[in-house]
Amino acid sequence: MAVTFSDLHTADGLKALEAHLAGKTYISGDGITKDDVKVFAAVPLKPSAEFPNAARWYDTVAAAVSSRFPGQASGVSASSAPAAAAPAASKDEDDDDDMDLFGDETEEDKKAAAEREAAKPAKKKESGKSSVLMDIKPWDDETDMKKLEEAVRSVQMEGLTWGASKLMPVGYGIKKLQIMLTIIDDLASTPIEEVLCEAPINEYVQSCDIVAFNKI
C-alpha cells in the first residue's frame, strides 16, 4: 500500500513521518530506496530532537547521499516553495525511472557510453624510441675517415636519425668513428650494424659495435 507524506516542512507533516518510522530504519524495505530519496528531498532541514525517528532516518539518508556524491560543494544555494512529497512509487514504476541513485547503470546508460567511446577518434599508438652510441672502426690507418663518416650517414632508414659524432684514437695511428643515432623501435626493422657492414659501406667499415643503448 502506498504511503503519502505531505507538508514535511511543518511539525504536523514531521509527526506523520515520525510515526511511520517507528521501529523502522527506512521508509520501505530493509535498505535505502527511491522512496527514501524522494521523502528526503521534501524535508528541508534535519528534524529536531522532538522527532528522533525522523532525525535518525534523515542522518542515514544524508550519509548515503553524501557517499554516493562525494564531490565538495561550491556554495550553491536554492530555495522553493514547500511542496508535499510525491507518493511512494510502486516497484513497477521504479523500474521505469530514468535515474536510480543507488542502483546499477541502465541498459540505455551502457549503450550511450559505448556509443561515446566508439565515436572517439582512435589514438595513434606512440612507438618507443631508443638512443644508441656506436663505435665504427676502419680497416686500417689509411682509411679516409671523412669518407667513412659520409658513407655511414648515407644510410637512410625509416625511423633512423643520425646525431653527433667524433673521431676517437684506437692505437697505431688508427682512429674510430663514435656516432650517436636515434631509432624508432617499430620502424627500424633491420639492425643498423648489419647495414653498416654491407657493401658499399664495408669498403670503409671493418666492424661496428653498440657501446650504449638506452630507451627514451
Curated annotation (Swiss-Prot):
A Pfam short name: EF1_GNE
GO molecular function per UniProt: guanyl-nucleotide exchange factor activity; translation elongation factor activity
GO CC annotation, single: cytosol
Region called Disordered, residue ranges: 71-131
Biased composition (Low complexity): 73-89
SMART domains from the UniProt entry: EF1_GNE
Coiled coil: none
UniProt biased composition (Acidic residues): 92-107
Biased composition (Basic and acidic residues): 108-128
Key words, A-Z: Elongation factor, Protein biosynthesis
PROSITE patterns, per database record: EF1BD_1, EF1BD_2
GO biological process: translational elongation
UniProt cross-references to PANTHER family, sorted A to Z: EF-HAND AND COILED-COIL DOMAIN-CONTAINING FAMILY MEMBER (PTHR11595), ELONGATION FACTOR 1-BETA 1 (PTHR11595:SF84)
Family designation: Belongs to the EF-1-beta/EF-1-delta family.
Subunit structure, as described in the record: EF-1 is composed of 4 subunits: alpha, beta (1B-alpha=beta'), delta (1B-beta), and gamma (1B-gamma).
Cited function: EF-1-beta and EF-1-beta' stimulate the exchange of GDP bound to EF-1-alpha to GTP.
Protein name: Elongation factor 1-beta
Organism: Triticum aestivum (Wheat)
